[in-house]
Amino acid sequence: MDAVLADPALNGRHMVSPPAGHATMQVRNVHKKFGDFKVLQGLNIEFVDDAITTVMGPSGTGKSVLLKHLVGLLEPDEGEVIVFGQDIWKASEDERYELRKRFGVLFQDGALFGSMNIFDNVAFPLRKHTDMAESEIGDFVMTRLQEVGLDRSAHKLPTEVSGGMRKRAGFARGLIMNPDIVLFDEPDSGLDPVRTSLLCDLIQQMHEQHGGTYLLVTHNISAARSCSDYIGMIWQGQLVHYGAADDAFNSDDEFVRQFLAGESAGPLGMD
């Protein structure tokens, strides 16, 4: 059973303590606002190695903003973002650049270059950031494409394949530099339930094969439950629950119950 910690910032709520393990990323009391809109309000969360963690919460609650903080694309107004023991905003520009190489990122649409075929899209980071020979790049790229089931589509343009295939190509590109951390920003967006389930299976398979820290942001409750080792719930810019995946579905927190059950009754409204 996970220990439960009282946190005054949660206005009486409780949250499950972080999972045991080596923390690769830590967010400490992070605040971020855009204009007068406060997105993150003292967020504290950490992510451990060799696990798949999913962060969930309503639209506009700061999940994608969290990802941008972790990869160093946004600087917090207050607080610290620690990656591999280093505060990334106390690091130099060159050090942040090197840290980003340890990340793989899968965006909602795959973020592929439309003028490049699948092979060249996946090869792009290797050509940009390494001095590998083309023959070595070719072998490496085809291995990744085989892993995601796209080796026969390497020559096709993104417009010539399905949305699910574009996401798998983006996944292959995200893994091409052998990252220690992989971030997924709503990877199931636009996919039907079957393709979502298959993508979840692929994520688990690749994590089992390559290890590392995988962090997913999604609204898909069934995918979060089946794909994750841990689930964190964010509401109003704060962490309201964090623990083993099944624990979230047994939470006594009113918001967590409402969100995961998809019910209209509860503290979460239309605004």
Question: Which residues are covered by each model-predicted region?
Answer:
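A short, proline-enriched helix->beta-strand linker immediately N-terminal to the Walker B motif
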Residues: 176-180
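Conserved ABC ATPase signature
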Residues: 157-161, 165
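Helix-to-loop junction immediately C-terminal to a conserved catalytic motif
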Residues: 71
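ABC ATPase NBD Q-loop/coupling interface
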Residues: 80-98
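Conserved ABC ATPase "signature" region
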Residues: 87, 134-152
